[in-house]
C-alpha cells in the first residue's frame, strides 16, 4: 500500500471513531439542551400545598385528589397512644396515628412530608376539654403517650416509605418543654423541627433553646387563621404576615433556615397566595378549612388549586412529589 493511501485510510478510521469517543456532532445540541433543562429544574424552588387538619383516611385521600403534596396533622397524646386530634375535644378526635401513618405510607409517591402539629405541650384546661388527653412530657419513655413513642411511630411507618416528618411547636414556651428537648436531641434522617412566630424570634429560640438543631433541620412558619387579617403589603420591615415570611425567606437564603411555610389560605384568597409565593418567597402554604377537618368540598379543592395553578404559571417553581427531599 502506498504511503499516501495508508495516510488516507488512517484518517478515515480516525473520523469513524470520533462519534464513539466524543459523541456525534448531531448529538451535541440536544445534549446542551438537556443540560440547560437540568440546570433550570435545579434552580426552580420546590413548592408545597399542605392540606390543613388531616385527621382521618378520608382527609388523606381527598387531599391527594386535590393535589396536596404534604399533610398537616394535629396530634395529641392519650394513655393508649397518639391520635390525630385538633382541639382535644371529643368531636375533633380522628384516627390513631398508627392507623393514619399506615395509610399515608402507601401514598408515599404523592406525599413529601407530614407536619405533626403538637397540641399537647400545652394542655387544654377548659370544661369541654377531653380529660383523657395527657401531657407527653410527663409520660415515661416506655409509655405509649411519650414523645419517644410518637417518634418511633413515624420511624416505623413513614421513614421506610420515604415520607419526611416535621415536628411543629406552636408557642414560644413550647421550646422550653421536655417534649421539645427530647425531639431536638433525637432528630434523625428525614426529621425536622418547625417553630411558629416572627422571624427574628424564631431564630433566637433556635439559637438558645434549640441549639442542637442544625440549620438544615430548622423550619419556620407564620400566619393567621384568617389570612387577610394582618397580611400587610409585603413591604413592611416586619410585624405583618407577608413581611415576616419574607424575613424568614431571607434567613433561609443565608442558610439559617431550611424551609419557610405560611398558613392558612382559604377559598377566594388567591391574591394572598400569589403574594406569599411571589413576594414573600415561601416554600409552601397550608390551605383548607379554618376550623374543620379536611374532606372533599369545592372550597378545599379551590383553595388547593390556587396554590397549584400559581406554581404552574411560574418559571421558578415546581410542585414537589414524594421523591423530593426537604431535609
Swiss-Prot record:
It catalyses: a sphingomyelin + H2O = an N-acylsphing-4-enine 1-phosphate + choline + H(+). Residues 1-23 form the signal peptide. The active site is at 52. The keyword Secreted applies. Its EC number is 3.1.4.41. Binds 1 Mg(2+) ion per subunit. GO terms for cellular component: extracellular region. Keywords: Hydrolase, Lipid degradation, Lipid metabolism, Magnesium, Metal-binding, Secreted, Signal, Virulence. Its cofactor is Mg(2+). One of its GO terms (molecular function) is metal ion binding. GO terms for biological process: lipid catabolic process. Mg(2+) binds at residues 72, 74, 117. It is found in: Secreted. A motif (SMD-tail) lies at residues 320-327. InterPro entries: PLC-like_Pdiesterase_TIM-brl. Gene3D superfamilies: Phosphatidylinositol (PI) phosphodiesterase. It is an enzyme of class 3 (hydrolase). The SMD-tail motif is highly conserved and may be responsible for structural stabilization. Catalyzes the hydrolysis of sphingomyelin. Sphingomyelinases D are produced by some spider in their venoms, but also by arthropods such as ticks, or pathogenic bacteria and fungi. They might play a role in pathogenicity through different mechanisms, such as membrane destabilization and host cell penetration, but also pulmonary inflammation and cutaneous lesions. Belongs to the sphingomyelinase D/phospholipase D family. This is Sphingomyelinase D. It comes from Paracoccidioides brasiliensis (strain Pb03). The lineage of its organism: Eukaryota, Fungi, Dikarya, Ascomycota, Pezizomycotina.
Amino acid at each position: 500500500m502506498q504511503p499516501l493511501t495508508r495516510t488516507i485510510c488512517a484518517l478515515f478510521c480516525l473520523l469513524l471513531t470520533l462519534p464513539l469517543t466524543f459523541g456525534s456532532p448531531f448529538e451535541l445540541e440536544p445534549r446542551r439542551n438537556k443540560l440547560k433543562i437540568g440546570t433550570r429544574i435545579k434552580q426552580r424552588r420546590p413548592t408545597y400545598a399542605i392540606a390543613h387538619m388531616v385527621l382521618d383516611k378520608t382527609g388523606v385521600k381527598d387531599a391527594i385528589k386535590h393535589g396536596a403534596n404534604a399533610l398537616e396533622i394535629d396530634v395529641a397524646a392519650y394513655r393508649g397512644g397518639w391520635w390525630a386530634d385538633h382541639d382535644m375535644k371529643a368531636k375533633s378526635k380522628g384516627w390513631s396515628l398508627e392507623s393514619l401513618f399506615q395509610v399515608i405510607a402507601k401514598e408515599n409517591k404523592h406525599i413529601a412530608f407530614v407536619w405533626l402539629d403538637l397540641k399537647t405541650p400545652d394542655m387544654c384546661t377548659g370544661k369541654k376539654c377531653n380529660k383523657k388527653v395527657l401531657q407527653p412530657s410527663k409520660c415515661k419513655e416506655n409509655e405509649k403517650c411519650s414523645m419517644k413513642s410518637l417518634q418511633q411511630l413515624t420511624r416505623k411507618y413513614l421513614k421506610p416509605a420515604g415520607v419526611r416528618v416535621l415536628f411543629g411547636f406552636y408557642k414560644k414556651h413550647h421550646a422550653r418543654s421536655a417534649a421539645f428537648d427530647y425531639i431536638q436531641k433525637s432528630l434523625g434522617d428525614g426529621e425536622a423541627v418547625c417553630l411558629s412566630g416572627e422571624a427574628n424570634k424564631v431564630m433566637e429560640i433556635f439559637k438558645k433553646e434549640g441549639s442542637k438543631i442544625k440549620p438544615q433541620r430548622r423550619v419556620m412558619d407564620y400566619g393567621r387563621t384568617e389570612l387577610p387579617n394582618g397580611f400587610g403589603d409585603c413591604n413592611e420591615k416586619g410585624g405583618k404576615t407577608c413581611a415576616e415570611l419574607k424575613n424568614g425567606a431571607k434567613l433561609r437564603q443565608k442558610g439559617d433556615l431550611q424551609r419557610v411555610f405560611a398558613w392558612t389560605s382559604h377559598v377566594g384568597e388567591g391574591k394572598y397566595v400569589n403574594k406569599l409565593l411571589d413576594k414573600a418567597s415561601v416554600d409552601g402554604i397550608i390551605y383548607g378549612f379554618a376550623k374543620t377537618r379536611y374532606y372533599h368540598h369545592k372550597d378545599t379543592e379551590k383553595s388547593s388549586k390556587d396554590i397549584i395553578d400559581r406554581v404552574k404559571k411560574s418559571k421558578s417553581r415546581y410542585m414537589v412529589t414524594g421523591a423530593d427531599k426537604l431535609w
